[in-house]
Regions:
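Short, solvent-exposed secondary-structure boundary/capping segments
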Residues: 129-137
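Glycine-biased, low-complexity coil/linker segments
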Residues: 101-103, 159-161, 296-298
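Intrinsically disordered, low-complexity segments enriched in serine/threonine/proline/glycine
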Residues: 100, 104, 165, 301-304
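A glycine-rich beta-to-alpha transition motif near the start of alpha/beta enzyme domains, typified by
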Residues: 1-99, 104-129, 177-290
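C-terminal domain-closing interface element
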Residues: 140-143, 150, 168-170, 271-291, ...
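Cationic, low-complexity basic patches in intrinsically disordered or flexible, solvent-exposed regions
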Residues: 154
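Generic short N-terminal amphipathic or hydrophobic helices
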Residues: 109, 151, 301-303
Length: 306
């Protein structure tokens, strides 16, 4: 008889994933599950699958693995990290980590092990509910031969009137190519082409960004998922690129299709800090058939609880 796996769907600024606690359930083929479950017509519908586990290392508390909607595994996801923070705190009783008391709120820190290293999640809690999560995304990298070949230049807008670059490669653990433009909707026609451009050996996430008085308007094409409502690492890469090219200061409001994120590129430690919301959508059970289905197989969701 097929095992039923409990899942929780969450989103951060519209970037939605399916979350499964691997301390309770074993998914035999995560890549196939991500493809099937992410289907918005025949599955649960999401940008991918996130697996939560206990860390095997004493330096971290929990682990995160992310599989995109096409089954490929991602190094890091800022929005998923925030959702994991909310999920863990509100679903773990009693809470095992120290909490700091503030004026009408509490704070706790989670050390999350990802494929791009350990990330710190700073949770702000009011009346037992996680109000917001700030993630230390680490330092940006501008040169990474494994992710970007500068000899093969991808298409880029002309330089601005004062000579600032029209685009910039930024790695936030995963690769991003940020293009400054007045037409962010061009992501719909150019995103896929750029993801697979020869300049990016491991493919690339693509951001089309427009500088506005109220912040930076960004639309994103995520590697392995296509157009998404938001991308945490993409928001960080865009803010860093805007600052690096002289378009903005170190604190930026990033306006994406699904919501807004606050990004700070801290001058003292060179780390990028991302703050934003995390929300539950629904939960339910889904069957994990034996053996694992072939890629593209569909697993039917049952007992959805709003």
């Amino acid at each position: 008889m097929s095992e039923k796996i409990h899942f929780t769907k969450m989103h951060g600024a519209g970037n939605d994933y399916i979350y499964v606690d691997t301390t309770l359930y074993n998914i035999k083929d995560p890549a196939a599950a991500a493809i099937a479950w992410s289907d918005r017509h025949k599955g649960i519908g999401s940008d991918g699958l996130v697996l939560i586990g206990r860390s095997p290392l004493p330096e971290a508390d929990f682990t995160m693995r992310i599989f995109n909607a096409d089954g490929s595994e991602a190094m890091m996801c800022g929005n998923a990290s925030r959702c994991i923070g909310k999920y863990l705190y509100e679903r773990t009783h009693p809470w095992p980590l120290p909490c700091k008391e503030g004026d009408g709120y509490q704070e706790t820190v989670i050390r999350l092990l990802t494929l791009s290293g350990i990330k710190l999640l700073f949770l702000r809690i009011v009346n037992g509910i996680v109000e917001s999560v700030t993630v230390d995304m680490g330092e940006p990298v501008f040169e990474n031969e494994r992710q970007f070949n500068p000899v093969i230049q991808p298409p880029s807008p002309r330089r601005g009137a004062e000579g600032e670059a029209g685009s910039l490669f930024v790695s936030m653990g995963n690769p991003h190519y940020v293009i400054f433009t007045n037409d962010v909707d061009a992501v719909e026609t150019k995103g896929c082409e750029l993801e697979f451009h020869a300049a990016f050996p491991e493919r690339c996430n693509i951001e089309f960004a427009e500088m506005r008085p109220d912040g930076i308007r960004v639309r994103v094409w995520e590697r392995g998922s296509g157009i998404t409502q938001a991308c945490g690492t993409g928001a960080c890469a865009t803010a860093v690129a805007a600052c690096k090219t002289g378009r903005s200061g170190r604190k930026n409001r990033i306006i994406m299709d699904g919501g807004e994120l606050e990004i700070e590129w801290n001058e003292a430690d060179n780390h990028v800090y991302m703050t934003g919301p995390a929300e539950f959508v629904f939960e339910g059970e889904i069957e994990d058939p034996l053996p694992a289905p072939p890629l593209g197989g569909v697993w039917s969701a049952i007992k959805i609880k709003k």
